């Protein structure tokens, strides 16, 4: 028969911090991380009171896992308390409520100390959304609604904490010394990716630099830490209580950069893990950049795209959109984009996390000029990255609807458009004119001036070469068939 554990606490252990160099982080781009640390435990048989104070301010207490990595010791946490409030002047006034403490005040340039009894600390709120109440202090038998000076607090007892900490009651049947691993999730830390793409004036080869930025607002610093970045849309519930950084905790933001390169990504279920090859030190409220990608000689292509319709026409449920005014309003701007294939043959070939791409052009004088940016989605290996960087200055487009006719008896509708593309540049260009065919599900192009490509169920694309100074006209007619009879014809 298994013997019952002794329930009397035999020892109180204070773990001030984890083992140096044994901390690791798995940071997700959804404002949370898994924090892992190694703590030295010296437990006696029975129930031990243990205090671990090296905890993130926005830790998720219910996520705590304390274990023996070797699997030899079964650590049983019978009870856990988390003290996570940041200590402020109001907090300490509340601790000494009902007691008399000293206050330092200045009168006519001279300092002196006066005693005052804390009747009310001011930490209590009259309602959840209301600001704290004013403190009430008794000085010389008189009550006042403000502090008489700077409070000078007495020495704190051992049960008071100024840093977030876990208090555990850990049961073990026999005495044991071990290096235990603690793991828990914490909010207020995240990472995001940025890409700098450098193009040359006379070449389609580009340089791609990828950076990961860590933003740490957990209330905890990490020294010499192993870091993994997890990319993907992971289902994670938000904190039950909104985690807000207290105003008292705000300090000057520290921004540092590193130059380590890591382009190895490993699969984790349906996500990807990027492991940084070197250890990182990350202070609280620090933002740090580390380089994870550097690719030279990436073959790219500048493209011009004209999506003329200012608003899309879409079917609604089982009903066709036969509104005569739908899809008529058009744009005159031709967008500029860069595209390249994310393949090993093109010096890339790694899963690229979503991030902002900034494009720079190296001019003839070798100086870099900013030419646009784009929020790129996550891109799997071998897929094409297409990033829109702005609008072409010397390319102009017009889009005009030339016909719209509905035949209720035949359940059909026809619609015709003409697109004009003008090139004011000194060199020839090719413009991709994309048109959305969205009034109804069944359609066909009954007439066209140029060949087109059907991109999907509702999109066609014309690749139109335009020489310098030329205006090209592209026209087409779409025939919608099998229109539902219940649609009201305008």
Regions found by a protein language model. Give the residues of each.
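Long, intrinsically disordered, low-complexity accessory segments associated with secretion
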Residues: 2-4, 10-490
């Amino acid at each position: 028969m298994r013997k019952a554990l002794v329930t009397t606490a035999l020892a109180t252990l204070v773990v001030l911090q984890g083992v140096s160099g044994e901390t690791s982080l798995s940071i997700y781009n959804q404002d949370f991380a898994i924090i892992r640390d190694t703590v030295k435990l010296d437990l006696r048989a029975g129930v031990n009171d243990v205090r671990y104070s090296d905890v993130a301010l926005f830790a998720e207490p219910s996520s705590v896992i304390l274990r023996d990595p070797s699997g030899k010791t079964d650590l049983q946490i019978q009870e856990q308390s988390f003290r996570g409030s940041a200590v402020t002047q109001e907090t300490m006034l509340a601790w000494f409520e009902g007691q008399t403490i000293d206050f330092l005040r200045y009168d006519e340039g001279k300092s002196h100390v006066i005693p005052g009894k804390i009747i009310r600390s001011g930490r209590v709120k009259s309602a959840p959304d209301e600001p704290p109440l004013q403190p009430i202090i008794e000085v010389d038998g008189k009550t006042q609604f403000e502090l008489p000076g700077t409070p000078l607090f007495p020495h704190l007892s051992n049960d008071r904490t100024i840093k977030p900490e876990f208090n555990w009651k850990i049961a073990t049947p026999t005495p044991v010394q071990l290096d235990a691993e603690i793991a828990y999730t914490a909010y207020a830390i995240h990472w995001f990716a940025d890409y700098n793409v450098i193009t040359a004036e006379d070449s389609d080869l580009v340089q791609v630099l990828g950076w990961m930025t860590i933003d740490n607002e957990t209330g905890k610093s990490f020294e010499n830490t192993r870091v993994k970045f997890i990319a993907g849309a992971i289902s994670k519930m938000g904190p039950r209580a909104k985690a807000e950084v207290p105003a008292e905790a705000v300090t000057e933001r520290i921004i540092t950069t590193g130059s380590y390169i890591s382009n190895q990504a490993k699969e984790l279920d349906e996500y990807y893990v990027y492991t940084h090859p070197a250890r990182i030190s990350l202070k609280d409220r620090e933002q740090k950049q580390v380089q994870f990608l550097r690719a030279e000689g990436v073959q790219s292509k500048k493209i011009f795209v004209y999506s003329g319709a200012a608003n899309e026409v879409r079917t609604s449920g089982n009903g066709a959109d036969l509104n005569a005014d739908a899809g008529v309003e058009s744009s005159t701007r031709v967008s500029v984009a860069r595209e390249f294939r994310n393949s090993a043959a093109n010096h890339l070939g790694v899963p690229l996390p979503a991030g902002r791409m900034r494009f720079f052009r190296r001019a003839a004088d070798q100086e870099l000029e900013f030419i646009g940016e784009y929020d790129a989605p996550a891109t799997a290996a071998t897929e094409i990255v297409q990033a829109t960087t702005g609008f072409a200055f010397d390319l102009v487009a017009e889009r005009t609807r030339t016909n719209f006719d509905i035949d209720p008896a035949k359940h059909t509708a026809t619609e015709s458009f003409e697109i004009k593309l003008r090139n004011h540049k000194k060199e020839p260009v090719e413009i991709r004119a994309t048109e959305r065919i969205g009034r109804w599900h069944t359609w066909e192009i009954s007439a066209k001036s140029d060949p087109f490509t059907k991109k999907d169920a509702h999109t066609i694309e014309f690749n139109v070469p335009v020489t310098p100074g030329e205006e090209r006209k592209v026209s087409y007619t779409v025939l919608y068939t099998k229109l539902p009879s219940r649609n009201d014809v305008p």
